[in-house]
Structures are given as structure tokens and as C-alpha cells.
Regions:
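Small/polar glycine-rich anion-binding or flexible loop at a beta-alpha turn
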Residues: 210-214, 230-235
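Gly/Ser-rich oxyanion-binding loop with an adjacent helix/lid
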Residues: 1-93, 219
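Short, histidine-centered active-site or binding-site loop motifs used for metal coordination
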Residues: 11-13, 105-107, 232
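Active-site nucleophile and cofactor-binding loops and adjacent substrate-binding regions
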Residues: 19-21, 227-232
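C-terminal nucleotide
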Residues: 77-225, 242
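Single conserved hydrophobic/aromatic residue that forms the stacking wall/gate
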Residues: 236-239, 243-246
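A short glycine-rich, hydrophobically flanked beta-strand micro-motif that places a catalytic Asp/Glu
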Residues: 5-9, 210, 226
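Methionine-biased hydrophobic packing positions in alpha-helices, especially
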Residues: 65, 192, 228-229
Length: 246
């Protein structure tokens, strides 16, 4: 169904900064072809096609969250996604007087040669160990912390840390959505710091530059939260008066 076409791509998204520039490219390209050649593909089909491009052709065993956010995201909304069922809902992104600030650390990042696929393998190993005794769990994110604690002696240290992080982070995500909907933005900011600490300590995907910058924000009054985002960028929640210091 595809005919000939010429394509020129321009973007102000930094490449390799971990803010889903590749998902933006693949999804934008898919939507463009869908319109140009009147392919009649649904948004969900475009998400799956764009995901397959990264998963099967590029070789990044990524989830579908980035592609889903690019295509289904709305202005001033946050998206809560169940990656198992692809059920989702949009909630209001009302951060009151606070601003969201993204910071590019300019540290080089190449996901294809990074630890991403290794972490995927480690999480699968953790789940396999758990399923030997608790086969009712299909996904690591669903496993309660107490079960992971009880099986600690069965894990290598790094695998134990990966399992613990995934279980806790899933709970933090649900709690974060609840806090935002209740307008508890300061408490949400606290969760961001908790997440970054465990991304660094237990999931081991941070770096010294990111850790330094997150710790530095704790000394800036009215910056209420900071964490790494995606690859090597940071996301902060701050009062507008502190943006220059960040």
C-alpha cells in the first residue's frame, strides 16, 4: 500500500538524552505514512508497529510505554498505563504553582549498547526464581515485597536488588498517580527522590553525574523533587523562582 515519497525530518529533541526521541521518530513517521497513504491504521496498531520497529529491528527489548505516551498523550494530562493489558486512563496534570523542568546532562547515551537489555534479562531471571515457588505471578511488578524478602537467599545480590526495585517502583507509580490526583505535589516530589535513589542503588542505571545533580537540587529551596528520566536526563519539580538556579 505504500507508494514513493520523500521525507525530511527536523526535531528539537536531543538525541540520546533518554527522552524517547526514537519513539517520537518512529511514531511520528508511522502516523505520517498512515495519513499520506490512507492506510486506515488505528492508534493502537500504530503503537504496536512503532514498538516492533525498535524491538525487532533495532534490537532494544523495550516496553511499549514510550510509544503509547507519544501517540495517546494529551496536553496537560498524565497517562496511567497497564503494559500487560494496554488499558490506560488520562488524569489531570495539575502541579499548582510548581513547574516541571527537564535537564539534559549532555552525558552520552546509547541504549542499544547500554544496560537496558541486561536489566531485562536480570528481571526475567528474578521472575523465574520466584515462579519456582509462586507460579501464580506472571509479571515481576505484581510480586509483593514480602515474597521477594522471603526468597532472598535464592537470589544473587544483583538479581535480588532488581526484583526489589521493580516491586517497589510499581507501588510508587500507583501512589504517585494518587498523590497527583489529590493535589499532594510535595509528597509526589518526595517519591521522585526515593525513585532516583533506588534507580541508582538497586537498579544501577544512574551515573555519578546524575546522582550529583539530584543531590545538588536538595540544597535548592522549593525544588521539591528530582530524578533521572529515561536515560541521562533529569526531571525536576520546582517553583518558577528557582528555575535560574537549576
Amino acid at each position: 500500500k505504500l507508494g514513493r515519497f520523500e521525507c525530511f525530518i527536523t526535531s528539537d529533541l536531543p538525541i540520546g538524552a533518554g527522552i524517547s526521541s526514537s519513539a517520537a521518530l518512529s511514531c511520528g513517521f508511522s502516523k505520517g505514512l498512515n495519513e499520506l497513504f490512507d492506510l486506515g491504521l488505528s492508534d493502537l496498531e500504530l503503537i504496536k508497529i512503532s514498538h516492533a520497529a525498535e524491538h525487532d529491528f533495532v534490537g532494544i527489548k523495550c516496553g511499549v510505554m514510550d510509544q503509547f505516551a507519544v501517540i495517546m498523550g494529551k496536553i496537560k494530562k498524565l497517562l496511567i498505563l497497564n503494559c500487560e493489558t494496554l488499558n490506560y486512563k488520562l488524569i489531570d496534570a495539575d502541579f499548582k504553582a510548581f513547574k516541571i523542568v527537564l535537564l539534559n546532562t549532555n552525558v552520552s547515551h546509547n541504549l542499544a549498547s547500554s544496560e537496558y537489555n541486561i536489566r531485562r534479562q536480570e528481571c526475567n531471571m528474578a521472575l523465574s526464581i520466584i515462579q519456582n515457588q509462586y507460579n501464580e505471578y506472571k509479571f515481576l511488578a505484581d510480586v509483593p515485597e514480602k515474597i521477594i524478602f522471603s526468597l532472598k537467599k535464592n537470589f544473587k545480590k544483583n538479581i535480588y536488588h532488581r526484583a526489589l526495585f521493580v516491586s517497589r517502583e510499581n507501588k510508587r507509580t500507583l501512589k504517585a498517580a494518587e498523590l497527583i490526583q489529590r493535589g499532594k505535589i510535595e509528597e509526589f516530589g518526595n517519591l521522585m527522590y526515593h525513585t532516583h535513589r533506588e534507580l541508582s542503588k538497586y537498579y544501577e542505571v544512574s551515573c555519578k553525574e546524575l546522582d550529583f545533580l539530584v543531590d545538588f537540587t536538595k540544597n535548592i529551596s522549593n525544588v521539591i523533587g528530582s530524578r533521572m528520566m529515561g536515560g541521562l536526563s533529569l526531571i525536576h519539580i520546582s517553583e518558577p523562582t528557582r528555575l535560574a538556579e537549576i
